C-alpha cells in the first residue's frame, strides 16, 4: 500500500485520486515560492560520459562536462523544475546537436531587478491613506528626503502631483503647513499650482485661506509665466481674491492685486464682488483698501443690490459713511425697486443717506427754525419778559426738556409759564402763548 506523502495530513481532506502532482508551493506566485534547498553532492563522481552517451553512440567528439546539478543559480528563485546545463555563450556549446531535449517555454535565467527600480517603486508606494513617502516627507519638513524622492520621481518619469485620498498633493500640504521653502522646491521640481483638491481649491486658494502671504509669494515667484490663473473659481464660486478678502489677509490682497487679479470679479453663486464681501464681513479696513485700489463702489450683485444696500440694511454706520464719501449712489435700485434709503432701518443711517449728518459731523451748527429765530430775537425776549414770560428754558433747569441724542436734529424750544403766576395776556390779539391755542382778543371796555 503506498504511503501518504509527507505533509498531506496538514492540508485538510483532499481526493488523492484527482490531486495533481507537483512540488510544494507550486500554486504560489513565482516571487513567493520558497527556495529549493541544496542537496549534498553524491558520493561517487560522475564519469565524463553522461546520459547523453546513448545519443552519441559512435561519435568521436569529446564530451564537454556540464555544471553539476543542484548548484544555487539565479534561476532557482523562479524555476522549480529539473536543472539542465546552461551554455551562456556559443563558444561553450557542444559541437554536436542536442537531440530529444525538451525546449523550456521561457528563459531559465531571469534578469534580476535593478536596485534603482526598487527605489522608484518604494518612493511611489502609497499607504492606506493614499499618501506617498513624498507627502510624509513634506509634512515633516524633511528637505533631504524630499530632494531624494524628487530625484527618484524624475528618474522614473513620475508625476509630482500625486493625490492622496483627500485629493491633496504634496504642494497642497506644503501650503497648509506654511512651508514657503518647501513650496518653492516643489514648484521648481514641476508641481502645478493649479492642481485642485476635493473642494476645488488651488494652492493659491489655500495660501489665502490659511493667511500665508509667504507661501503665496513663493507660489507666484516660482511658477513659470502663464502657468498661474488668478481668476480660477473653487467649487463655491470664489476666486483667490474673494478668499483673501473673507479671511482679512491684506498682504495677500495686495499681492494678488499687484499680479493682476480682477478687483471687481464676481463669485458665481451670487455675483458679489470682493467689495460687497468686505462690507458683509464688516471689515472697514478691507473696504478702504479696495476702494483705494479702484474698486467699483456701485457694483451690483445678481439681485441688483450694491455694497451700500448691504451696509444700510445692516446698519453699519462707518461703512455707510465711507461708501457715501466714495461716491456710492443712494438712489440706486435693486431688482425689488428698493434703494439703500428704503432698506435702511437706523435713523442715523437715514440721516447720512439724506446728507444731513454729514454737515453735523463737520462741526457746523444746524440752521435755526423760523419760530425759534423769532422767539430768540432781543425784541421778542424783551416783550416776553415784560409780560412775565420766561425768555429761555435755561432759567428753570427742572422744566427744561431733555437734550437730543447726537446725530438727531435739534427739537424746537418750547416756552413754559410758571405754575404759580397768573397767565397774562399779550397786548395784541392772536399771539400764541406757548404750545396752547391762540388767546381770544379781550372785549373793549364799555362794550356789551
UniProtKB/Swiss-Prot annotation:
It is found in: Nucleus; Cytoplasm; Cytoplasm, Perinuclear region. ANK repeats lie at residues 129-161, 166-195, 199-228, 236-265, 270-299, 303-332, 333-362. Signal peptide: none annotated. The modification Phosphoserine is found at residues 39, 369, 396, 400. GO terms for molecular function: DNA-binding transcription factor binding; histone deacetylase binding; transcription coactivator activity; transcription corepressor activity. GO terms for cellular component: Bcl3-Bcl10 complex; Bcl3/NF-kappaB2 complex; ciliary basal body; cytosol; midbody; nucleoplasm; perinuclear region of cytoplasm. Its main location: nucleus. Polyubiquitinated. Ubiquitination via 'Lys-63'-linked ubiquitin chains is required for nuclear accumulation. Deubiquitinated by CYLD, which acts on 'Lys-63'-linked ubiquitin chains. Deubiquitination by CYLD prevents nuclear accumulation. Residues 437-448 have a biased composition (Pro residues). Residues 377-398, 425-436 have a biased composition (Low complexity). One of its GO terms (biological process) is DNA damage response, signal transduction by p53 class mediator. Residues 1-54, 356-448 are annotated as: Disordered. Coiled coil: none annotated. Keywords: Activator, ANK repeat, Cytoplasm, Nucleus, Phosphoprotein, Repeat, Transcription, Transcription regulation, Ubl conjugation. Residues 361-376, 411-423 have a biased composition (Polar residues). Contributes to the regulation of transcriptional activation of NF-kappa-B target genes. In the cytoplasm, inhibits the nuclear translocation of the NF-kappa-B p50 subunit. In the nucleus, acts as a transcriptional activator that promotes transcription of NF-kappa-B target genes. Contributes to the regulation of cell proliferation. PANTHER family: NF-KAPPA-B INHIBITOR ALPHA, NF-KAPPA-B INHIBITOR ZETA. Component of a complex consisting of the NF-kappa-B p52-p52 homodimer and BCL3. Component of a complex consisting of the NF-kappa-B p50-p50 homodimer and BCL3. Interacts with N4BP2, COPS5 and PIR. Interacts with CYLD. This is B-cell lymphoma 3 protein homolog. It comes from Mus musculus. The gene is Bcl3.
